[in-house]
Amino acid sequence: MNLINEKLNNLENNAAKSPKEAVVLLNMGGPNSLYEVGVFLKNMFDDPFILTIKNNFMRKMVGKMIVNSRIEKSKKIYEKLGGKSPLTPITFALTERLNELDPSRFYTYAMRYTPPYASMVLQDLALKEVESLVFFSMYPQYSSTTTLSSFNDAFNALKSLETFRPKVRVIERFYADKKLNEIILNTILSALNNRKSQDFVLIFSVHGLPKSIVDAGDTYQQECEHHVSLLKELMQQKNIPFKEVLLSYQSKLGPMKWLEPSTEELIEKHRKSHVIIYPLAFTIDNSETLYELDMQYRLMAERLAIKEYLVCPCLNDSIEFAKFIIGLVENLKSE
């Protein structure tokens, strides 16, 4: 964490002559050490957009019970990932690349549940006398549990800075952009590494949600389904056939009814096939991609004797994704 802070400070100091527009990448964050696992879980399950219990006291009590039941298991997961989440260092690397490619703006990031928090980042941008901000959701599809939670946090942090009133614009979803979907398709083809696509069942795995949240009006499921349909159209245009192309939901928690089918269920259903997974709701690798998809489900695939099991990386700090982000920000300026 100290190394990341040092690099972040250096990066921000180098921008001191600074562009007057800043782009803040918003994401959920992840533990920067095993010590932060408890902080991460506590903040997540105290979020009313995640745990939608209206009574504040009850939400905190239920949240505490969930944290206590999960903390040791979560620590073991992060131990397998080197003692921390990869999300923060990869996001930092992405902002470095963005600042190299586009010195006309200052790119930074804020996390929802672990440092650097939006309040910390915005205080720094106020000192830099930034005149305009772009809050950029790192979630391709919109959900109240992710996008809205991050925006709400960022705007509340901004309101607390009484003398800092920059112009603010937002990018809240980008899944329908053809350039993004071409990058995703190229990532899938790269993971196939000249294997025949028609031999594989392609599963687009996204983070699951309790069905009650979708029933209350959250558009996440609809947008994920639309995203898959757009990718199918692009595959047809480029004549890239798969045995099947499917959408699944991962990371179910608790006894509630969640969106279906689950990723586990589809992997088991296609046990006699070659399977390739693309993490469609994530832009940066995290425990749900590197542990759940690439370790936990891989072991399951081996037990099921699946012929071949591949997991695609997220877009991460790739130059293609960085250029895509810059393009979205440029288009926002011209609108």
Swiss-Prot record:
Keywords assigned by UniProt, alphabetized: Cytoplasm, Heme biosynthesis, Iron, Lyase, Metal-binding, Porphyrin biosynthesis
InterPro entries recorded: Ferrochelatase, Ferrochelatase_AS, Ferrochelatase_C, Ferrochelatase_N
Residues annotated as binding Fe cation: 207, 288
The reaction(s) this protein catalyses: heme b + 2 H(+) = protoporphyrin IX + Fe(2+)
Subcellular location: Cytoplasm
Keyword Lyase included in the entry's annotation: yes
Disulfide bonds: none
EC number: 4.98.1.1
NCBIfam families attached to this UniProt entry: hemH
HAMAP family, alphabetized: Ferrochelatase (MF_00323)
Protein name (record): Ferrochelatase
Record organism: Helicobacter pylori (strain G27)
Protein encoded by which gene: hemH
